[in-house]
Amino acid sequence: KSTLIRHLNRLIEPTSGEILVEGTNVMSLNKQELIEFRRRKMSMVFQRFGLFPHKTVIQNVAYGLEMRDISQDERNKISMEKIEAVGLNGFENQYPNQLSGGMQQRVGLARALATDSDIMLMDEAFSALDPLIRSDMQKQLLSLQSELKKTIVFITHDLDESLRLGNHIAILNAGKLVQVGTPVDIVMNPADDYVAA
């Protein structure tokens, strides 16, 4: 699953096939076009947060904007909006090691939101969190999604989580796609014993 999501933005180079995003074949992009594509079209939230330990919360959130040469005033304005959106107002000057795991994951989410990319890739983003924080993050993601209407590719090994968060689910088993459908389709018409289990 993690390998698949890294193929979507070519963090891992696929050996064959096409990756189509809004009619653009990501496989055909040269290095500079790929950099621009990643900056503008996709953002990623990692399982292990992926935060810079030497940067404050606001600096971490602003990082993608800095890479786009957005002015510091505008970066800070956008970053504070996203920090507030994920419930971390008042923590903008803290460093990652001063935050709980759930708070660090919120910083990662705020950073992904700050770039306003069309597609968010979330790789096991909540799996390292304890169950209560995980449930809270799921609620927050659903709330943000209803407001922002972003495409989110959410990788999880937890079927319950996928059923709660997804409106279109793809199930992989041993690297093979075994079923694609809505949560109701998956539950009511499992493709095989693996999906039914």
Residue ranges: model-predicted function:
Residues T24-N25, A62, E66-D69, D73-F91, ...:
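Conserved ABC ATPase "signature" region
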Residues V180-G181, N189:
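ABC ATPase "signature
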Residues K55-Y63:
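Short coil-to-helix segment of the ABC ATPase nucleotide-binding domain corresponding to the Q-loop/switch region
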